[in-house]
């Protein structure tokens, strides 16, 4: 039986989810994306400030599904037809530069006995937040500008590459079986093959049938997509890979299958479900879980968090001169803020680091703290620079 104790945390979280876009729309001097407001409200209501709500097992599971749905939507949102070519090549080069810089910094920190793994730390500094960048650009109707193309491409590589490499780290630090390697290679090869075919072939005719079914109470497309998400999420987790990779793969596959006008309505339904319910639960729960008191009382954390925040900005901002022919210096500065915004993948990577024993808990907490600050500060700066440009 569900008790009041079980239901109360979810009730408070849903109340905060309703308040977040309202508060976001009221802030005029400081432009805060509603995702940032969700995290702030979670911190405020959490056990370390007002103590109105704490993370229960049921809320933890809903948050985990919200994280999976976020990566599912991220994969679904990636438009390979649009990115295929110079945009993706340039963004991949930029990410490679970020990785080399991040690992180099990680090696220095390892010599200073701050981190255990230079690779995982460096990888953590190369992440981006496509799930935050795209909604901001969409809300501003700024998806077609050269800046938007660069920002989406940079964020895409900052999501995909770290997750793929992190899956290899999970395998190497576990007890790998041949099936683990086969599964990872199959996922990558399958996505590459599907991308190649989708850019050259018309999507299957059954999409029209699915579009008709979405008008009925059966909602067959939503059920099929949910089955795909659950299946890949389960399979990747069962074989020792990061389960988020499965959610991302499910979104990419569905996006490729519905990448036409018939898929617009299906996409709208997913956005309603994701951003209306599950994704806000993830971000609010992230805020609730954020140990503000512990960080405030830790001298090490107070030193590490701002340093890690600057490292995020440096590693992702350093490659922006690659875009000097397309973007002016102010747009490149804005691109650095956009690319350095990191949280969902960062949380996944720190979880991997803790579970495999190659990242210290306090370092993981400081990285997540830097990630939380990045989504509080960098999108607001990005909006300010873009608004200034529009004016």
Feature names for model-found ranges:
Residues 8-22, 79-118, 122-123, 176-192, ...:
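Entry/N-cap segments of selected transmembrane alpha helices
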Residues 9-14, 56, 60-66, 91, ...:
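Structural signal for the N-terminal portions of transmembrane helices
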Residues 17-21, 43, 47, 73-75, ...:
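Alpha-helical transmembrane segments of multi-pass membrane proteins
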């Amino acid at each position: 039986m569900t008790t009041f104790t079980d239901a109360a945390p979810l009730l408070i979280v849903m109340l905060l989810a309703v308040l977040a876009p309202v508060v976001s729309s009221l802030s005029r001097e400081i432009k805060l994306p509603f995702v940032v407001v969700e995290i702030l409200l979670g911190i405020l209501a959490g056990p370390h400030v007002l103590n109105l709500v704490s993370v229960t097992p049921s809320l933890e599971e809903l948050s985990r599904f919200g994280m999976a749905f976020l990566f599912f939507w991220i994969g679904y949102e990636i438009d390979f037809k649009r990115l295929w070519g110079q945009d993706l090549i340039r963004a991949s080069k930029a990410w490679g530069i970020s990785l080399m810089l991040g690992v180099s910094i990680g090696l220095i920190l390892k010599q200073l006995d701050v981190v255990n793994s230079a690779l995982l730390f460096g990888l953590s500094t190369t992440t981006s937040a496509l799930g935050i960048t795209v909604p901001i650009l969409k809300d501003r109707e700024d998806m077609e500008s050269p800046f938007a193309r660069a920002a989406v491409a940079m964020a895409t590589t900052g999501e995909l590459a770290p997750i793929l490499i992190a899956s290899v780290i999970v395998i190497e630090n576990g007890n790998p079986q041949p099936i683990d390697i086969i599964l990872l290679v199959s996922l990558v090869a399958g996505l590459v093959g599907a991308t190649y075919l989708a850019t050259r072939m018309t999507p299957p005719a059954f999409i029209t049938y699915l579009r008709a079914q979405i008008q009925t109470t059966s909602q067959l497309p939503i059920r099929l997509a949910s089955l795909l998400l659950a299946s890949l999420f389960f399979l990747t987790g069962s074989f020792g890979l990061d389960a988020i990779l499965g959610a991302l793969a499910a979104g990419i596959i569905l996006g490729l299958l519905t990448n036409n006008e018939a898929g617009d309505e299906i996409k709208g339904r997913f956005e309603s479900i994701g951003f209306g319910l599950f994704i806000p639960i993830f971000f609010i729960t992230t805020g609730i879980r954020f140990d503000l008191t512990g960080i405030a009382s830790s001298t090490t954390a107070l030193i590490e968090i701002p340093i890690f925040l600057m490292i995020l900005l440096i590693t992702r901002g350093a490659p922006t001169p690659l875009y000097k022919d397309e973007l002016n210096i102010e747009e490149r500065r804005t691109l650095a803020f956009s690319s350095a915004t990191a949280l969902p993948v960062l949380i996944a990577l720190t979880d991997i680091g803790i579970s495999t024993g190659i990242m210290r808990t306090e370092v993981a907490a400081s990285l997540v703290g830097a990630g939380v600050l990045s989504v509080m500060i960098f999108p607001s700066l990005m909006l300010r620079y873009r608004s200034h440009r529009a004016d």
